[in-house]
Curated annotation (Swiss-Prot):
This is RNA ligase 1. AMPylates itself (auto-AMPylation). The keyword ATP-binding applies. It comes from Danio rerio. GO terms for biological process: response to reactive oxygen species; RNA repair.
Length: 325
């Protein structure tokens, strides 16, 4: 399978969108809703979205693998966001104008400080050598995941820098009907973006692990192909989400041949998410994590140790993975 596009900016909706005067279903305290119209966006058409590879949009937090201090490293998504005052001005403008276009930022004063090693995502535009915000008022970027930073403890649980590996959920070989959790060298994931999912991420829509035994894994973007995707047409996509088992997902991301990524989220269509019995949980999963991938000095709650204890075992779904008490 060819490596699909990496997420280095906010992904645009496949349809043109409009702003409605109703509370957001996605963001608390946002008094307007961004919804899809029935018109496919010109950008999607220009990238030939009808011929693109359709993949499952996974609900987690975005990560990136690239070098840090000369070694392959996991980086966490951290958008540089406006100050409260600047954000208030931006939202007021967006609400009154029904668009973000035309709003003027003062990049030097309107944005919060970021950690020392923060870097802007690759596709962020620059003016006068400085990264500038996207249409949502954010500057997408990354920070390296350090084991000493408790803010990123769930990120760090899926990487072992000592052995240079990460815990990855993907399809099992050529069998897209089965999943596997495997330890993958970070060097093999270089310049890829992945989604961290699990017990303590985004409300855990897939039901992984428990408070006693949290479970987190990385899912490479584009790895979960949609075998029978709907045509890129408003009503067909709505029906697919509501009527097909394969449609019990957060959304679709189309990977176009020119590298462009296009998405649709259930919220764009006024549909509920999360849903019961997600499609991710309809497939069995086999574990391939060897004891040598774990740090011998780590605690018994170390994820690599936990997964190595069930090495070569198959579970009916990712939410059914259980470790010995």
């Amino acid at each position: 399978m060819r490596r699909l596009g990496s997420v280095q900016q906010k992904i645009p909706c496949v349809f043109l969108t409009e702003v409605r005067d109703e509370p957001s279903r996605k963001r608390d305290c946002q008094q307007f809703q961004v919804v899809a119209t029935e018109n496919v966006s010109p950008a999607a058409l220009a990238s030939d979205v009808h011929c693109a590879a359709a993949t499952e949009k996974v609900d987690g937090t975005c990560c990136y693998v690239t070098t840090f201090n000369g070694e392959p490293y996991l980086w966490a998504r951290l958008d540089r966001k406006p100050t409260k005052q600047a954000d208030k001005r931006f939202k007021k403008y967006q609400y009154s104008q029904k668009t973000c276009k035309g709003f003027v930022w003062n990049v030097n004063e309107d944005f919060r400080e970021v950690p020392e090693f923060w870097m802007a995502a690759h596709r962020v535009q620059h003016e006068n050598g400085h990264p500038v915000p996207d249409e949502h008022g954010h500057i997408p970027g990354w920070v390296p995941v350090d084991h000493t930073n408790k803010q990123y403890c769930w990120h760090s649980s899926v990487v072992n820098y000592g052995t240079g590996v990460a815990l990855v959920l993907k399809t099992h070989g050529e069998d897209e009907g089965q999943l596997e959790i495997v330890s993958v060298p970070l060097a093999d994931l270089m310049e890829q973006t992945l989604e961290l999912i699990g017990t303590n991420v985004n409300g855990n829509p897939y039901g992984l692990g428990s408070k006693k035994h949290p479970v987190h894994v990385l899912v490479p973007h584009g790895v979960l192909r949609i075998r029978n995707p709907p045509a890129v047409e408003f009503q067909q996509i709505c029906s697919w989400f509501q009527e097909c088992q394969e449609g019990r997902v957060e959304g679709i991301v189309w990977h176009c041949d020119d590298g462009m990524l296009i998405k649709i989220h259930r919220h764009h269509l006024g549909l509920k998410w999360p849903v019961a019995d997600t499609f991710l949980n309809t497939r069995p999963v086999v574990v391939h994590v060897d004891e040598s991938d774990a740090d011998p000095c780590a605690s018994e709650k170390d994820l690599f140790k936990s997964f190595s204890s069930v090495n070569r075992q198959t579970f009916s779904s990712v939410r059914d993975i259980q470790f010995e008490p």
